UniProtKB/Swiss-Prot annotation:
Residues 28-122 are annotated as: Disordered. GO terms for molecular function: receptor serine/threonine kinase binding. Expressed in shoot apical and axillary meristems, but not in other vegetative tissues. Detected in a group of small cells at the apical region of the central zone of the meristems. It is found in: Secreted. This is Protein FLORAL ORGAN NUMBER2. GO terms for cellular component: extracellular region. PANTHER family: PROTEIN CLAVATA 3 (PTHR36349:SF2). The lineage of its organism: Eukaryota, Viridiplantae, Streptophyta, Embryophyta, Tracheophyta.
Amino acid sequence: MGRLFLCLVVAWCWVALLLVAPVHGRVGLPGEFSGDQRPVPATSFDLVTEPKTKQPRGVKGTRRPSWSSWSSTASRSSPPPGRGAPSAAAAAELRSVPAGPDPMHHHGSPRRPEHARSTGRP
């Protein structure tokens, strides 16, 4: 009985492997649920944000969307970090951090929590 059940399970697995793959890959017919009934893929961001224009010869086109934060100078090659002075591209990418208390830890208070607790009172 055990061998018969095992043979049936193995046969079912082979049938599933051989039949399921072609079913998922076939072209769908109208009114039929098949493997080709998937949502339409989204268009590329290049087609959505920028119209195609001819580039002059010798100018490389960019594949970045218009909303990208990378400037055109950042795409130029620069020396590895830590060697020599930072290039203009690296300097353009540096961000400034506002001074003052850390709002995540001190909740905007000018005092640190340790100073507020140690008032010297008994």
